[in-house]
Every structure is written in structure tokens, then in C-alpha cells.
Amino acid sequence: NGAPQPFVRF
């Protein structure tokens, strides 16, 4: 998986 994943910080 070379595509960056949307990461959400809380």
C-alpha cells in the first residue's frame, strides 16, 4: 500500500 491513508487525530 503505497498510497497515504487519511489519518484523523482526536
Swiss-Prot record:
<keyword id="KW-0527">Neuropeptide</keyword>
<dbReference type="GO" id="GO:0007218">
    <property type="term" value="P:neuropeptide signaling pathway"/>
</dbReference>
<protein>
    <recommendedName>
        <fullName>FMRFamide-like neuropeptide PF6</fullName>
    </recommendedName>
</protein>
<keyword id="KW-0027">Amidation</keyword>
<feature type="modified residue" description="Phenylalanine amide">
    <location>
        <position position="10"/>
    </location>
</feature>
<keyword id="KW-0964">Secreted</keyword>
<dbReference type="GO" id="GO:0005576">
    <property type="term" value="C:extracellular region"/>
</dbReference>
<comment type="function">
    <text>Myoactive.</text>
</comment>
<comment type="similarity">
    <text>Belongs to the FARP (FMRFamide related peptide) family.</text>
</comment>
